[in-house]
């Protein structure tokens, strides 16, 4: 058994936990290897680029917040990922710092359970081939620095859904429904729901609302504008700039993310404690 370890190197507490984890793994006779930048900060010679880490380990440990987990998941392929929260919100990271050793031990013993999460795949035709990008949370196309309001034309399975005049469009998974989409007015969707949500950003129409669709639908998006460049972001990372009328196709990826589940963690409780769901002002609930 060998673990691939990814650290949010900007957090000193994450580095401290990584050192404790290494000592514990060595005492157990368990192998490990760090992502390159993490290895540099921790002072370890055992490292590999994040793109190669999944070929050299059996499972991943993410030490950081939700952003670190998203980064790790993009490269984990089908390997299980243990998310240890050393961040601010920790909505996706299943385990607290105090639960780290117990969680890792369950993976070593093979007594863990998995939460399987759907990913989005965004593809853009370029130079005779398709550029493809994956996202666990969301794919976002924005107007960027374009000074006017462009129209985002959306088709579902080749049929026109609508043309949205807005600052951008968010395509989110059920996992990503509590991220950018929620901030833009989208609904909260239970994690195992087989749906996507299309959420416009600041639409210039009172009648426009987010729409929930089957995750079997193929979504095509293009930006109608006379000029300009429009950012295509996947899980908060800029992937490329789009030209007017350049088509982006978004669909369910065949690659799933396997997150090691915390059996003591209830999704409804997470909504209440992390997002203060349903909490009244001055309520003790």
Curated annotation (Swiss-Prot):
Cofactor annotation? a divalent metal cation
Q: Which UniProt keywords apply?
A: ATP-binding, Cytoplasm, Kinase, NAD, NADP, Nucleotide-binding, Transferase
Which amino acids does the record list as binding NAD(+)? Answer: 66-67, 137-138, 148, 165, 167, 178-183
Localization terms from the record: Cytoplasm
- What chemistry does it catalyse, as a reaction equation? NAD(+) + ATP = ADP + NADP(+) + H(+)
Its EC number is 2.7.1.23
Which range is the signal sequence, renumbered to this chain? none
> Which GO terms of the cellular component aspect does the record hold?
cytoplasm
According to its UniProt record, what is one Pfam family this protein matches? Answer: NAD_kinase_C
Among the GO molecular function terms of this UniProt record, one is: NAD+ kinase activity
Where are the active-site residues found?
A: 66 (proton acceptor)
Domain of life, source organism: Bacteria
Which biological process terms from the Gene Ontology are attached to this UniProt entry? Answer: NAD metabolic process; NADP biosynthetic process
InterPro entries named among the record's database cross-references: ATP-NAD_kinase_N, ATP-NAD_kinase_PpnK-typ_C, NAD/diacylglycerol_kinase_sf, NADK
Q: Which PANTHER family match?
A: NAD KINASE
According to its UniProt entry, what is the function of this protein?
A: Involved in the regulation of the intracellular balance of NAD and NADP, and is a key enzyme in the biosynthesis of NADP. Catalyzes specifically the phosphorylation on 2'-hydroxyl of the adenosine moiety of NAD to yield NADP.
Q: Which family does it belong to?
A: Belongs to the NAD kinase family.
What protein is this chain from? Answer: NAD kinase
Native organism: Chlorobium luteolum (strain DSM 273 / BCRC 81028 / 2530) (Pelodictyon luteolum)
């Amino acid at each position: 058994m060998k673990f691939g370890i990814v650290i949010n190197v900007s957090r000193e507490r994450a580095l401290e936990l990584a050192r404790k984890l290494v000592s514990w793994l060595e005492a157990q006779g368990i192998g490990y290897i760090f992502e390159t930048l993490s290895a540099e900060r921790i002072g370890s010679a055992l490292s590999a680029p994040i793109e190669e880490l999944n070929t050299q380990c059996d499972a991943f440990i993410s030490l950081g917040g939700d952003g670190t987990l998203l980064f790790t998941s993009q490269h984990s392929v089908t390997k299980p990922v243990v998310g240890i929260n050393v961040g601010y919100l920790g909505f996706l990271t299943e385990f607290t710092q105090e639960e780290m050793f117990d969680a890792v031990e369950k993976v070593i013993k093979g007594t863990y359970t998995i939460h399987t999460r759907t990913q989005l795949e965004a593809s853009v035709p370029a130079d005779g081939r398709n550029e493809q990008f994956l996202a666990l949370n969301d794919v976002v196309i924005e107007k960027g620095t374009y000074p006017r309001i462009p129209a985002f034309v959306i088709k579902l399975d080749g049929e026109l859904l609508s043309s949205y005049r807005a600052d951008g469009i968010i395509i989110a998974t059920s996992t990503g429904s509590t991220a950018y989409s929620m901030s833009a007015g989208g609904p909260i969707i239970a994690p195992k729901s087989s749906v996507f949500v299309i959420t416009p950003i600041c639409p210039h129409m009172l009648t426009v609302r987010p729409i929930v669709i089957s995750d079997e639908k193929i979504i095509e998006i293009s930006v109608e504008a006379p000029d300009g460049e429009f950012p295509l972001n996947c899980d908060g990372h800029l992937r490329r700039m789009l030209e007017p009328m350049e088509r982006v196709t978004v669909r369910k990826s065949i690659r799933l993310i396997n997150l090691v589940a915390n059996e003591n963690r209830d999704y409804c409780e997470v909504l209440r404690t992390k997002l203060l769901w349903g909490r009244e002002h001055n309520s003790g609930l």
